Each structure stands twice: as structure tokens, then as C-alpha cells.
């Protein structure tokens, strides 16, 4: 829009044209106020009824909330106004009239159920809180990319349509691909390993993953954003170091560049950048500490995966981000390298006190051992021939991890439900919008 001024840039003494949504109208008799909202904030528009054209006043005061308008006029200093300035209008033009009955209140004065908010996402994102979450999300992804570049990693984009699942199993969305069965990719794991085996060496990807899991919890999605790293000539400890750097960089960027957004969410004082290095607990130590809390009905034994209540008990005990290392080889994927004893793997998880954020480890780069890993987990190596054949041509030791982008944001901002961190979430019940 030509000659438009954002509300945050309107200065006393200027003649401006501002455009946005009608946030609120207050009629006090001889004088009335309209609050106009745009992406940068709000500005007050003053109507002095006895001194203005009747048609101008009627247009400004009878327009429904959330209608889209432009206002042209002079900016004056007014300490009592929400932003210290106000506009005396010369013209008001209604660009799009809103219904008088709205499915939710973007001002936040009336609470709405999450399902109502997601069904009416455009309206929901007009709230300060909704806008703040996704501005912070954008800053997180910007900082993550910068941290990866600082770690000498190159951004890649891998296929999301595959012939076989990354980890086998049934948690795949099947599709028809020119008459053949194919699947939506559940992870870029195998692809990023193949690229790390080239001269590029260190790679990262930020992209969607699809998992046909029938979970219906506040922390699971069927389409999510995965932040992935893979590095040649890296072991599992190197990968954990990069993970710490990336996660900490995201927090630091938000703390420095998103103070207004954090204030809108009411978490300015509670927001803390994680201390490094993150504690590193072995799987065995994790089980011992969980059992010692007495929070579980039954004691965990070697080989058990950690239940949700166990993760929570351990998170409360540790009190910050931490790693769990040296998992039993039998409960980690086939591509994770084992330690020399064969009982423990190089796999690790990075945890927030509320939940798991990252899964990673050193990968098996020796072809014969990799094939054996397939067979031990009941997978057919022939189905992954495109992957295994590249290990015949010299595959360096390599390690990496995958981080759930929405989980990172959810835990960073203490959101109640992971769906709040997604524009248009996909779960078992939601396919639209």
C-alpha cells in the first residue's frame, strides 16, 4: 500500500495513513476513540463529534470490530493514549467489513478453547500472544540456522516421499506414487547420512516429518518440524556438543531479540538461557535416579524404555536440560553404533524437564555391521539397498541427531499444548484448516 505508515512509526507532527484492524471502539458521548491495530502495535484515533463531518464520524464509530480500515490524518502527542500519540482523522475507509459476531475475541478479554482457536486460526493470530509465538518461532529458526553455519554445516533439503520407512514399522502414511506404493518420510535420517558421506561432510536440515502414530496427547503431532544435524568424522560426543550450541543459541537469540514478544506472553522474568554444559547421565544412572524418586508404581529395570512419568520425575530431579547416554543397544535403531561391548549403544537423548527433545548418536559406518543391525531388528536390507550400497564406497565415521522444532518452542515458552506452536497442526482429529 503506497505511503502507508506502520502504527509504531507514527510520530507527532506527521500526516500519515495507517492501515489495520479495528481493535476496539469506545464512545464517550461528545468524543469517541477507535483503536487501530497492525502488526507493529496499536494507535488511537480520536473523533470529536461536534467538530467533524457526520459521515466521517459515522463511518469510524459504526464499523465492526476486526474490520480492515485505513485512516489518514494528523498525528498528535497524547500522553493518555495507549502509545502516547493519537490520530485526528481526515478520512476513514473501510476495506473489508467483519461480521458483528466473531467466533473468538482476538483482544483476549474472553477466553476461547484451543479447538475454537485452531478452527479460526486467522482470528487467533491477531492476538498479541498468537503473534508473539510465531515471531519467536521465526527467531528460533533464524538463530538455529546461524548456529549450524557457525558449526560449518551446510543446509540441505531431502525428499519427503520415500519407498521405505526410515526405521521400518507401521508408523507411516502410505500414498500412491504413479501406481506404486510410497510413504511420507518419517525422518531425513538415511538421506542426511548419505550426504554426510560426501565431501560436504556436515549438514543440517529444517523440514517436515510425518508419523502415523495414534497418540492424542498435548505433546504429539502427526506432522512436525524436525531440526536435523549430521556430521562426518564426528562421534556421539561431538554431536552432543553441537546440539548444546544450537539449543543455547536459540535461547540466547530469543532473550536478546524478542523481549516484546516474551512480555506479551508474560514470561519475561521466567525466561532463562540454559547453562552449559548440559549434564550427561548414563541410561543406568537415569534409571537409578528415577527409581529413587519413588514416583513410579513399578521399578524400572535394565532394558526398559523410560515412561512419560519417569521422564518427568527425572526432569524434576535434574532441573534443566540434560542428556541421557549409553542406552541399551537393543532399544535403539539399527543405524546407531554400539560401544565395543555390544551391550551399550552410542545413542543419546537430550531432555528438557518436561519431555524428550532430541534423539541422536554415532552411526554405524561399517557395512557388514550395518547389515547385521538390519537383520537383528527384523528388517530386510534389500529394501534399503539405495542406502546400504553407499557404504561400499568409503563411509566415514559420522554422528548426528534430530530435534523436534515444536517441542523446542513448546518447552521454551512453557506452552500447555504443542499445537499452539504450529500454525495449522495435524493430529488424529485435525486435517483442516
Curated annotation (Swiss-Prot):
GO terms for biological process: aspartyl-tRNA aminoacylation. It comes from the Archaea. Mg(2+) 3 binds at residue 356. The record marks 82 as: Important for tRNA non-discrimination. Residues 189-192 are annotated as: Aspartate. It catalyses: tRNA(Asx) + L-aspartate + ATP = L-aspartyl-tRNA(Asx) + AMP + diphosphate. InterPro entries: Aa-tRNA-synt_II, aa-tRNA-synth_II, aa-tRNA-synth_II/BPL/LPL, Asp-tRNA_synthase_2, Asp/Asn-tRNA-synth_IIb, NA-bd_OB-fold, NA-bd_OB_tRNA. ATP binds at residues 211-213, 219-221, 356, 404-407. GO terms for molecular function: aspartate-tRNA ligase activity; aspartate-tRNA(Asn) ligase activity; ATP binding; magnesium ion binding; RNA binding. It holds the Pfam family tRNA_anti-codon. Keywords: Aminoacyl-tRNA synthetase, ATP-binding, Cytoplasm, Ligase, Magnesium, Metal-binding, Nucleotide-binding, Protein biosynthesis. Binds 3 Mg(2+) cations per subunit. The strongest magnesium site (Mg1) is bound to the beta- and gamma-phosphates of ATP and four water molecules complete its coordination sphere. Mg(2+) 2 binds at residues 356, 359. One of its GO terms (cellular component) is cytosol. It is found in: Cytoplasm. Its EC number is 6.1.1.23. Its main location: cytoplasm. L-aspartate binds at residues 167, 211, 359, 363. PANTHER family: ASPARTATE--TRNA LIGASE, CYTOPLASMIC, ASPARTYL-TRNA SYNTHETASE. Belongs to the class-II aminoacyl-tRNA synthetase family. Type 2 subfamily. Homodimer. Aspartyl-tRNA synthetase with relaxed tRNA specificity since it is able to aspartylate not only its cognate tRNA(Asp) but also tRNA(Asn). Reaction proceeds in two steps: L-aspartate is first activated by ATP to form Asp-AMP and then transferred to the acceptor end of tRNA(Asp/Asn). This is Aspartate--tRNA(Asp/Asn) ligase. It comes from Natronomonas pharaonis (strain ATCC 35678 / DSM 2160 / CIP 103997 / JCM 8858 / NBRC 14720 / NCIMB 2260 / Gabara) (Halobacterium pharaonis).
